[in-house]
């Protein structure tokens, strides 16, 4: 729903398609309008078969589990926001370029390995964004939330006092992959509430 709210702003006029595997367009429109974190969104939202219309801006909406099956070309998509958390390895990301011909893929989690012919660049703004070269980096990621919190502090401490070695402990907020109460999961640690 965050992508859809961005699509209705003047900044992101190019957004044309959402592929959400978790639910249909009616559920997405409802979650967009009634957001538990940001409150009620005061935009006109309408749902038609495979579209969400926000303030007259039409967004194609599909729910394909395999992104290679999504009709991206119908919506003239050339930049993908990969936010499933499932496609974070080169073998899952390279088909965006090799099979679908995407210009750019922006991944919402850290990525390791060679993608689209280059080592993945995990950017932490204010730390290493100068390494980004648009002529060679087709895949971009903003690293992890923990890295984004830690890197600026480590940079300042290291530049002023020199860090020889260190260890961190992080207390992370609840995520969508965790359960509020104990439940059966293949990862027994994450099965605990």
Region locations from a protein language model:
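Rossmann-fold NAD(P)-binding glycine/threonine-rich loop
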Residues: 86-137
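Glycine-rich phosphate-binding loop and adjoining beta1-alpha1-beta2 segment
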Residues: 14-54
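Single conserved hydrophobic/aromatic residue that forms the stacking wall/gate
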Residues: 1-8, 12
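Glycine-rich beta-alpha junction loops
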Residues: 21-24, 111-112, 144-146, 170-177
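Short, well-ordered coil/turn residues at beta-beta hairpins
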Residues: 21, 81-83, 108
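Active-site-lining helix/loop region of Rossmann-like oxidoreductase modules
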Residues: 13-14, 46-47, 135, 151-193
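A structured beta-alpha segment of the ubiquitous adenosine-cofactor-binding alpha/beta core
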Residues: 38-91, 134
């Amino acid at each position: 729903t965050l992508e859809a709210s961005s699509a209705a702003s003047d900044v992101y006029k190019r957004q044309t398609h959402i592929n959400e595997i978790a639910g249909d367009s009616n559920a997405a429109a409802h979650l967009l309008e009634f957001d538990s974190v940001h409150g009620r969104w005061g935009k006109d939202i309408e749902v038609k078969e495979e579209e969400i219309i926000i303030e007259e801006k039409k967004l194609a909406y599909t729910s394909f589990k395999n992104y290679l099956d999504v009709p991206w070309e119908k919506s003239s998509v050339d930049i993908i926001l990969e936010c499933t958390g499932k496609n974070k390895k080169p073998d899952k990301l390279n088909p965006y370029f090799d099979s679908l011909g995407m210009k750019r893929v922006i991944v919402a989690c850290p990525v390791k390995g060679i993608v689209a012919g280059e080592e993945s660049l995990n950017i932490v703004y204010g730390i290493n964004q100068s390494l980004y070269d648009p002529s060679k980096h087709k895949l971009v990621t903003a690293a992890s939330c923990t890295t984004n919190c830690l890197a600026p502090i480590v940079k300042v401490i290291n530049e002023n006092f020199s860090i020889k070695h260190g260890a961190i402990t992080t207390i992370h907020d609840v995520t969508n992959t965790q359960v509020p109460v104990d439940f059966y999961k293949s990862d027994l640690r994450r099965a605990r509430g």
